[in-house]
């Protein structure tokens, strides 16, 4: 963890992070994690900085050692209806609501907090400063990446397993050639253009 982060005075803290705001396809996935202070997990860092092998190993360790963890999501239709920011906030609310233990404080990666029934604080670069947020980042990323691999099996021509739905040159090329799948986000500009909605 880079800079020192001063934790709030609370006994049960959940960390929350999201994955999948930028892709053109699939859900935005969030996770909430409450770590067990008596069972520390070594090597937590922002999920994007870890190798896939290390991320998967930490994913299993978090599932085993965390006091509670849960996932939330907002589907492409919700993203299109609400916009990506509001859909992300909704997915975060769902992740916190699904925790088996109710936290008394929530730390959220980024600069905005969704409305929650308990105190919360946004932490910029929280995924590299707060262990609970790092753990949430790992849970969300592994979950979403697996969904993209499954989607790739259904639509093998788009390369979802490689680019995870992000607007790479390859993805944009296939989108233009093949059109949008039912899982593409119709409100995102490259998809809009292909559908003739832009």
Swiss-Prot record:
Manganese or magnesium. Binds 1 divalent metal ion per monomer in the absence of substrate. May bind a second metal ion after substrate binding. It holds the Pfam family RNase_HII. Keywords: Cytoplasm, Endonuclease, Hydrolase, Manganese, Metal-binding, Nuclease. Its cofactor is Mn(2+); Mg(2+). A divalent metal cation binds at residues 17-18, 109. GO terms for cellular component: cytoplasm; ribonuclease H2 complex. It is found in: Cytoplasm. Residues 11-198 form the RNase H type-2 domain. Its EC number is 3.1.26.4. Its main location: cytoplasm. It catalyses: Endonucleolytic cleavage to 5'-phosphomonoester. One of its GO terms (biological process) is mismatch repair. The keyword Cytoplasm applies. It comes from the Bacteria. Belongs to the RNase HII family. PANTHER family: RIBONUCLEASE H2 SUBUNIT A, RIBONUCLEASE HII. Endonuclease that specifically degrades the RNA of RNA-DNA hybrids. This is Ribonuclease HII. The gene is rnhB.
